[in-house]
Amino acid sequence: MKLVIDDACYAHKEIFSHFGNISTIAGRDINSTSVKNADILIVRSRTKVNHVLLDGSQVKFVGSTVTGLDHIDQDYLKSKGIKFFSAQGCNSMAVAEFVISAIVNLADELDFDYQKKTLGIIGIGNVGARLAKKAKLMGIKTLLNDPPRQMYENLPNFVDLKTTLSADIVTFHTPLTVNGKYPSYQLLNENNFHYILDKTILFNVARGGIIKETIWQEYKTLANIIDCWEDEPNINLKLQNTAYLATPHIAGHSIDAKFIGSFMVYEALCDFLGKKQDSNIKNLINLDKLSINKDTLKNTLNKIYDFRQDAKAIQDINNFEDYRRNYPVRYEWHHFKSKTTLPIA
C-alpha cells in the first residue's frame, strides 16, 4: 500500500509507516502525478483536494490532519466513493490559548481590566466553545453568536451578530463557507463594519476571507490581532501594518494540536482498513510536567510561548510559508506547573 503524506504532518513516520510505503511531500507540491499511484492521501491545509488532484488516481482514503475544510472538495470525494476524514477540533485548545494570551498581554500593555470587558465570540464550534469556557474561568463576560447552532439547538444564551459585534473584544471562529443560509465569507463587511468601534479589539483566527480585508484596513480599532489572511502567503501588507499582532496562521500550531490531528487520522485509517491500533502511539506526546516560576499570568503565558516572536518572524512576509513549516516547539498549558493559575478548560 502506498501513502502520500504532507511532510508537515506530525510524526508521520512513527504513526503511519506500518501501513505501507510512505512518500512525504510538501503540501503545496502534492500534485496529480505524485498521487496517481497512491492508495492513501494525508494532507494538511496547503493541498487542494479536488478532481484536478485525484482524477485518474487510485486513492481510496483522504485524511486531513487539520480542522479547516475549505481545501477539500467533499462533494467530489463522495461522488467517487473516496472515504474522507477531517481532524475536527484537534487545534481547539491551541487557538483558544492564542486568543487568551493576546487578551492578557493587551490588558497589561493598554492598562485595562479584562474582567470588565465583554468578549464576543462568533462561531461556537470546537474553538469558540473552548474559548468561552476559558473566558468564564477568567471572569470575562461572553456574547455568543452562531445562527446555525441556534437554529437547530435552540440554545438559550446566544445573541445576534449585531449584538456580538458591539462587544469590547470580537473574535471570529467560523469555518469559511460561501453557500448555504449562513455563509461566513466576508461576514464582516462594508454593511456591518460600522458596529466595530475605535475601542474594539478585533481578532481573526478563523479563516482568511471571513473579514473583508479592504474594509478592515481602513477602519480604526483599539487593536487588531490577525492570524488568518486572504491569499496566504501573499498577505495584505497594509492590514499587517495596522496589527497589534500579525502572525502567519499559526494559532493552532501547538505540538499537541499537530499530534492530535495526526492521531485522529490514524484512528480513522485503522477503522477504514480494519487494522488494530497501536496503543504506544499515544505516548508520542507524553512528557513530564514543565515548571514556570513567574508571578503574573502575562509573564507565565509569555514564558510558555511568546507569540510576538511569530509576528517578528513575518515582518518580512517572504518568511511566511517557511516559518509555518518550521514552526518552533510550542506545548499547550496543561503540560506546565506554574505559580499562577492557568485557565485550563
From Swiss-Prot:
Q: What is its EC number?
A: 1.1.1.290
Catalysis: reaction(s): 4-phospho-D-erythronate + NAD(+) = (R)-3-hydroxy-2-oxo-4-phosphooxybutanoate + NADH + H(+)
Q: Which InterPro entries match?
A: D-iso_2-hydroxyacid_DH_PdxB, D-isomer_2_OHA_DH_cat_dom, D-isomer_DH_NAD-bd, Erythronate-4-P_DHase, NAD(P)-bd_dom_sf, PdxB_dimer_sf
Gene3D superfamilies named among the record's database cross-references: 3.30.1370.170, NAD(P)-binding Rossmann-like Domain (3.40.50.720)
The keyword Cytoplasm is assigned to this record: yes
Its annotated pathway reads: Cofactor biosynthesis; pyridoxine 5'-phosphate biosynthesis; pyridoxine 5'-phosphate from D-erythrose 4-phosphate: step 2/5
Pfam families according to UniProt: 2-Hacid_dh, 2-Hacid_dh_C
Catalytic residues identified in the record: 207, 232, 249 (proton donor)
One example of the protein's molecular function in GO is: NAD binding
Q: So where does NAD(+) get bound?
A: 146, 174, 227, 252
Residues annotated to bind substrate:
45
Q: What keywords are assigned to this protein?
A: Cytoplasm, NAD, Oxidoreductase, Pyridoxine biosynthesis
Q: Which GO terms describe its cellular component?
A: cytoplasm
Q: Which GO terms describe its biological process?
A: pyridoxine biosynthetic process
Places the protein is found: Cytoplasm
Family classification: Belongs to the D-isomer specific 2-hydroxyacid dehydrogenase family. PdxB subfamily.
Function summary: Catalyzes the oxidation of erythronate-4-phosphate to 3-hydroxy-2-oxo-4-phosphonooxybutanoate.
Quaternary structure note: Homodimer.
What is the protein name for this chain?
Erythronate-4-phosphate dehydrogenase
* Native source organism of the sequence: Vesicomyosocius okutanii subsp. Calyptogena okutanii (strain HA)
Gene from which the chain derives = pdxB
